[in-house]
Each structure stands twice: as structure tokens, then as C-alpha cells.
Amino acid sequence: MASLVYRQLLANSYTSDLQDTIDDISAQKTENVTVNPGPFAQTGYALVEWTHGDITTDETVQQTLDGPYAPSSVIIQPQYWVLMNPETADVIAEADATNKKYACVMLAPNTEEGDKQYTILGRQITINLGNTDQNRYKFFDLASENGETYSKIQELLTPNRLNAFMKDQGRLYVYHGTVPNISTGYYTLDDIANVQTNIKCNYYIVPKSQTQQLEDFLKNGLPPIQESRYIMPVERSVQNIYRAKPNEDIVISKTSLWKEMQYNRDIVIRFKFGNTIIKSGGLGYKWSEISYKPMNYEYTYERDGETVVAHTTCSVAGVNDFGYNSGSLPTDFVVSKYEVLKGNSYVYIDYWDDSQAFKNMVYVRSLSAEFNAINCTGGTYDFQLPVGQWPQMRGGNVTLNSDAVTLSTQYTDFVSLNSLRFRFKPAIGEPFFEITRTRETRLYGLPASNPMGGNEYYETAGRFSLISLVPSNDDYQTPIQNSTTVRQDLEQQISDLREEFNQLSSEIAMSQLIDLALLPLDMFSMFSGIKSTIDAVKSVTTSVMKKMKTSTLAKSVSTITEELSDAATSVSRASSIRSNASVWNNLVDTRTQTSVATNDIATQTSRIASKLRVKEFATQTEGGLSFNDISAAVLKTKIDKIETVQPKILPTIITESVDKFIPTRQYRIIDKDIAYEISNSGKYFAYRVDTFEEVIFDVEKFADLVTDSPVISAIIDFKTLKNLNDNFGITKEQAYNLLRSDPRVLKDFINQNNPIIRNRIEQLILQCRI
């Protein structure tokens, strides 16, 4: 049988030679190297760690206390508190709105009650005010409708020379009361957002999000650092207004060998979604997969008078798997899996261009980026059925919003590029998508069937900024640029080979596959069909055996071997010898020794099924076909179909085939006229062999049978057998041969083009994916 190759690999996977061990040790050797980069970033200390820099999030951190600012006339932005810190008792703020005039004055402690004269908005006014408190200052809010007569509205009594106001929602908010019992009130001023405020004392700006901290200042005073003689108030008007340029290269710091450069770039991103559509074999009514795949795109655009050559790679993560199944007949329309971008997904766009910013992108910090939103609308895809009107998947929409940026590496056919990875978060929108002529309608997201929607590419504009440590000599390029590790190259080749492997599933002829599954494949015949390995079969086989040690199957064999040894020891030492059945029960799981009344049969059977594969290796029946035979035959067929494959990739591919081929398996044990069938997915059946009538599944009986009865791969499972019998009718002999997975009978049904048997074998082949 073809599964002989797996037996040989497992039997020899524990051998190793001394040279391999030496190579492994040398590959793991590391060295500590100390580098003194010099006084960068305006500090006298060497850098501790260079990483990808800041990662943007949707959280904005604002400065708590901004200032102090000198007296000035400004239009304060809404939702920012102005914290005033006057030195003398006088008018400290005034505002001239259309419907009302506003002013705030401060009185020092021990100020007698009486008429006070102030200049408010250019006019001399007189008002009766006073502050009899011995230690605290008093702030008065004054208001007037004509600008001549003012009246007191609110008062604030405080030991600190601090008061605050804020514009928000068309209102002017102020504080009143006696510290610490203070609260806010508000006045309504017309067009307050555009009203200029004359602030006649030093002041600070505090964001609304820090209101709690502001009230702490009002109650307890400013922190000591704000009262330092080294803090000098400045006019807001002296701030430089700087207009950013599309290309900026700014020297942050520099020494003889290295310098820090800040690169700011306005960029245009264009990208394409890639997709893969795999149609199942058979009559042409079934699709096995519609999925996204990475897609490269190269383009040029103009920036600041120069032509920029750019390269992008678009990939997705966190996609949602959907499926549609209209029935079990071979002519029923089925889409086993199609991927959809939704709100929990991510879109990654790796960007590189030929500018100076990417020349030495090795040590980077302070990385940030922002982009315009991208609207992506899906197109249509026709499911071309052999007969009848075609269903059509159409519609779908997401809007991609900029979410984060990190460093990355892009792979082209010739070189790997240090690049920036921009992460976008989709937000679903209209229109919805649907599959016409089905019940699949009013679904939201962007399906993988036609994500481009007729567009050649999607485009957005944005800007990124980063600070990079580069050589002071601009002609020198860091050696790591445009390089990649051997492991990265290997992973890329393995990824490409996986995709090619999975696409070959629909090209396998079933009758030839059965013949191949019956052949006693060994390691030499498995690998000798590859042109590039004809002269290196021995080395390839050795590498595969070494890699096989890490497979899940090899670990299961080792674990169960130890458990069997422990079980045998416990039997020999026990005072009363137990049956072999009880030993196997303990091996499988002590919880399987329960009564039929246990409501967790599915969990128990799935645990047993996961270990029956190992038992099948040791007790495979003569003449019966197993899942491992089909897996090995598919593996051999696909290897032969691939024109070129690197020998160093084969160990990973073959080891993955052992663990991942046909993930859903059913195993069968026959006891006289009753067949017991369990699946590693938790499904279980017990039925009569002659009539396929279901009976009660006896867990204890099944556990006893596991010990002495051979384990049979249920190539044709119970549901398929019942469907075959109901639609075509089969004899008792045919039924018994199918239960034993007799390859001759399977091939007869396939040659007769029996749609039910062919569909079952096709599904097994399609499960041979890595």
C-alpha cells in the first residue's frame, strides 16, 4: 500500500548523525556585540534599543498643561479650558459678543466694598465690588447688554490666583463657588466660537479631557515647576507657521559616522486585491474555495516634480469564512468556503519606493502615518454551471481606514525590500452582497469573488514620517539593505509551493489515484520522480526523516508507545490480570469507561478517533484501502506534477501532508452484522451491515472491540453508503466490500461514473491541502 512510505519515515525518523547535531549547535550560536552610536536625539547617552518606533493607535494623548502664555487677544478653540493666573487685581479677561458683553475681574483679599472703576472693551465703567475675606481672592463675572452698565453674575472665592473658562457647544463655561466646593455654570453668547477673547494676564491651556486635573489646580494651585523662575511666558504670535513639503529630509543629530534623519513623505498608495477561485472536480456544480491571496503591484506617480517608482503588496488577515450548500446531490450548487472582509478583519499594504527614505531603513523610531479612507466595492462573479441559469455573487462594500504602521519586508522575483506596512481597518457599508438565485442575500462585507469591482487598482493619498539612523556619508549604504535571511527565502518558496499543491487537487484522475494508492510506495519511489532530486534522493530522504520527528503523528506514536508500555507493566504487576480491553480503555481515556447514559459520547468518540489513526498503522487489514494510502498517493501525484521543487522544501511539505491531509476522518469497526463508525469531529453511528438501519451506539461494547478488532478507514462513510443504497441500491456483498474499503469495488464504482462515490473521493482529494 502507498502508506508504506509513511511507515518507513516514522520508523526511521529518530535517527540522527553527528554532523547534523554539530550544524544545529553552530546555527544557534550567538555573540554579544556592543555598539556606541554616539550622542543622538539631543541626549548624552547612547541609544538603548532601536525598534520599529511608535505604533499608531486610535488614542490621542494630549498635554495636560500647555503654557504659560503672555497676555494676548486670541480666538480660543472650543473644548479647551483657559486657566488664568493673574498677578494683579484688575480685569483679567473680556469678550465682546453680539448679544452680550462679558468680563472677569479679580479682587485681592481685604478689599473694601465700594465703587471700582475698570476699563472694559475700551470703555470706563463703574461698579460696586468688594472682598472682605482675609486670605482669599475673589473673582467676579460681569455681564452687560449695552456695554455701559455691568452687573455681577457669578463669584469664585479661592486662596489661589486661578480661574478658568471654556467655550463648548455654543456656551461659555465658568467656575463659581468657594474652594474646594466649586462647580461650573455657563452663559449663552452669540457666535461664541468666533468671538475674540482679550486675556490680560498669563494663562495656560488645558484640554477638556483633563477637566479633573484642572479642578485640582483650582483647588490646590499650580505644581511647583510652573512657578519656577526659568519658565518665561511667550506671545502666541511668535509661533512659527511651518508649511510641510511633499519631500522633507531633516537632520535631527549628527556625529562623524552616524546621523539621525527625519524623513517626511507625501505618498500615493495604489494596490490590488488578489484572489484564488478553486473549482471542485466532478460535474461542475461545486466550488471548493474562493479566497484572498497577496498581490504585488508596481506603479509610478509624480511627487514634488519627480517621478517616483513604487511597489506595494496587499494582503489580508482575520477574514471571515462563509459557505453555501444547496444539497448533497452531485448536481446541487455548492460553495464550500468563500472569504469575506468584515469589521474584524485587517488589510495590510506594504509600500516601498525608490526615495532616500527607504535606502537605509534599518534603525527606525518615531514612525507615524495617516491616510485618506479608501472605499472598496465588490463586483460580480458568475458561477458557470453546466446546465441552467448561473448564480452570481455580486456587491459588497468596505471602507478602509488607516489604523497603524510598522516596518516590513516585501518579496519580489529578484530581491527583498525593506518597506513600510500600513494597516487598515475595514468598516462595512452599502451595498450588501448576495448570491443570486439562492437564499444568500443581504450579507455585509467584501467577498473575495471579485473584490476589485472592475477597478484596475484602489488608490489613496497620505503621509508618513520616521526618524532613521543612517551613515553620515550619504554614499554609504548599510549592508543589511535589500537582503534577507535564508529562512525568509525558504518560507516564501514553501508558501508558493503550498499554493501550487492545493490548486493541483482538481487535476487528479480518481481511477489512477486508486491504482497508485495500491502500490507499495517507498521513500525512493516517492522522491525519485522529481528531476531536481534524482541525484540526491538519499540526502532528501534523510532530511525528510529528520523533519518527520516534529510531526504530530510522530509525537502521537511516541506517546501511545509509552502508554502501551506503561499499561502492559501495570497488567503484569496487578494482583488480578485485567483484560486487554480494559488496558486499551485506560490508554484511550479513563473517561470512556462510562455508561451509555453519559451525555458526552461525542467528546469520548472524538478522543478515541484521534488515536485510532495510530492503531490503524499497526493493524491495517490486508487488501483494504486507508486514508493514509490516499494521502500518500495524492502526495506522490502532486510531487510528480510540479516541474521544479527545491529539495530543501520537501521535508516541510511532506511533514505537513502527514498532519494536514484529510483532517476529517472516519474509522469503522465491524462486529458480526453491526458496524461502529466514529469521526474525529465527534460524530458516531452504529448500524446494521445488511440494511444500514441505525441502532443504539454502545460505548462500552465499542471500547471492548477496539482492542482486538482491526480498525478500518471509512473511505465510504455511513452517510454516503446510505445515500448510495437509497438512490441506486447495492447488494449485501457490495455493501460489505465498501465497508471494508475494498479498492477493487471502489474502482468499479468510479469507472461506472457513479456520482455519489466519485463525489466522496473528490471530497477526500480536496481535503489533501497544506
Swiss-Prot record:
InterPro entries per record: ConA-like_dom_sf (IPR013320), Rota_A_VP4 (IPR042546), Rota_VP4_MID (IPR035330), Rota_VP4_MID_sf (IPR038017), VP4_concanavalin-like (IPR000416), VP4_helical (IPR035329)
State the span of motif (YGL motif): 444-446
Positions in coiled-coil regions = 480-507
Keywords per UniProt: Capsid protein, Coiled coil, Disulfide bond, Hemagglutinin, Host cell membrane, Host cytoplasm, Host cytoskeleton, Host endoplasmic reticulum, Host membrane, Host-virus interaction, Membrane, Outer capsid protein, Viral attachment to host cell, Viral penetration into host cytoplasm, Viral penetration via permeabilization of host membrane, Virion, Virus entry into host cell
Which GO terms are recorded in the biological process aspect for this UniProt protein? permeabilization of host organelle membrane involved in viral entry into host cell; virion attachment to host cell
Where are the residues of the annotated region Spike body and stalk (antigen domain)? 244-475
Motif (KID motif) on chain? 638-640
Hydrophobic: annotated segments: 385-405
Q: Which cysteines are joined by disulfide bonds?
A: 314-376
Q: Looking at the record, which segments are called Spike head?
A: 65-222
In chain numbering, where does the site feature Cleavage fall? Answer: 229-230, 243-244
The ranges of region (Spike foot) come to 506-770
Q: Motif DGE motif: residue span?
A: 304-306
Q: Which GO terms describe its cellular component?
A: host cell endoplasmic reticulum-Golgi intermediate compartment; host cell plasma membrane; host cell rough endoplasmic reticulum; host cytoskeleton; membrane; viral outer capsid
The family line of this record is: Belongs to the rotavirus VP4 family.
HAMAP family assigned to the protein according to its UniProt record, in alphabetical order: Rota_A_VP4, Rota_VP4
Give the miscellaneous note. In group A rotaviruses, VP4 defines the P serotype. Some rotavirus strains are neuraminidase-sensitive and require sialic acid to attach to the cell surface. Some rotavirus strains are integrin-dependent. Some rotavirus strains depend on ganglioside for their entry into the host cell. Hsp70 also seems to be involved in the entry of some strains.
- Its protein name is Outer capsid protein VP4
